[in-house]
């Protein structure tokens, strides 16, 4: 029987302007639900989830940061030891997309190239209000050399594929990352029994 490998832990920090849907993406991934009541994240929230892959298990530590300017000074310390930075914008809010350049630069300042960056265009369900095309998002990701995907936390669109992309890009996952993204290994999502306390403070983002 194969020996049991130690559980690898990876820190994912979610960044982006206020109200772009960072909390809602995490909530949809963790609990497969969407809360229509908007409640701004205060400071930093933490949750964790175990992902069961083909031949290993990883623990994802999800750090949800506040988008308000008054909390901006807290964020660099959370970026510093992160494995992944997930930078979210609202496809119906062009300014939030433009501001992702600063978020990417902040991550690179703190972590250099030693971090996986994922650019996420959220709220694709707002079709009639879209201000940022998928081509613009893809081009920006190519310019910065980061991963790109569009999602809708409200509709549950591309949430699992987002985390599959992240899992495939993690250190030690070379065999997974060599797989074509559209054929990536299926992930059995189960909530970790050691999820951080504080769930009761979590509010869904109206996205």
Swiss-Prot record:
Cross-referenced Gene3D superfamilies: P-loop containing nucleotide triphosphate hydrolases
Domain of life from the UniProt record: Eukaryota
Chief localization: Golgi
SMART domains per record: RAB, RAN, RAS, RHO
Chain residues carrying a lipid of type S-geranylgeranyl cysteine: 205, 207
Record key words, sorted: ER-Golgi transport, Golgi apparatus, GTP-binding, Lipoprotein, Membrane, Methylation, Nucleotide-binding, Prenylation, Protein transport, Transport
Subcellular location: Golgi apparatus membrane
Motif (Effector region) on chain: 38-46
Residues given in the record as GTP binding sites: 16-23, 64-68, 122-125, 152-153
InterPro entries in the cross-refs: P-loop_NTPase, Rab, Small_GTP-bd, Small_GTPase
The family this protein is said to belong to: Belongs to the small GTPase superfamily. Rab family.
NCBIfam families per the UniProt record, alphabetical: small_GTP (TIGR00231)
Functional summary from the UniProt entry: Protein transport. Regulator of membrane traffic from the Golgi apparatus towards the endoplasmic reticulum (ER).
Protein name: Ras-related protein RABH1e
Organism for this UniProt entry: Arabidopsis thaliana (Mouse-ear cress)
